[in-house]
Amino acid sequence: MHPPPVSGGPVTSKVILVGQAPGVREPIAHKPFAWTAGKTLFRWFQEATGLTEEALRAKIYFAAVCRCFPGKAPSGSDRVPDPQEIANCSSWLNREIEILRPRLIIPVGKLAIAQFLGSTKLENVIGRSFRSERAGGRFDLIPLPHPSGASPWHKILPGRDLLARALELIADHSAMKALKNSGLRARGPGKTLLP
């Protein structure tokens, strides 16, 4: 693991989005999903909910299975954190769930999904909502595939249709609707981030 750790910032929210780990550029940008995969993720959310990246970053708590960039794999792609690294960071996610008491958690990608549902095929979980428990909290869980350009899963069938269904479930969830209707204000008089 390569410091510094990356988090989404001090946002109190009933919605937590959980990613795998920061990529190589996120520590420089000081925010999760700061590069190509993030652009795709925020486009998905904007199309489904109407919320911009700025509004989502201000209203959703961004967490990760691992807090630091895990380094590169021999293939040149980002290395998947190993079980010991995941165990070392698990207390952070547990504590965040204890403190925030989310109503909705959105795990993004296989590694994040596995932390809640075990190892499974994406076809078995994307497009579905689950009631889950962790760290003393009960919440709804709506998984998303990783938005990486390296994986075509979300671009082809059945992935494309399952992703659309998952985004519908997220947009229709009461916790997400509450965020959308919260009237978040941007800096400056009369500016609103949310419709």
Task: Name what the model sees in each region.
Residues 1-179:
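A polyanion-binding, active-site-adjacent surface
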Residues 185-187:
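Short polybasic linear motifs
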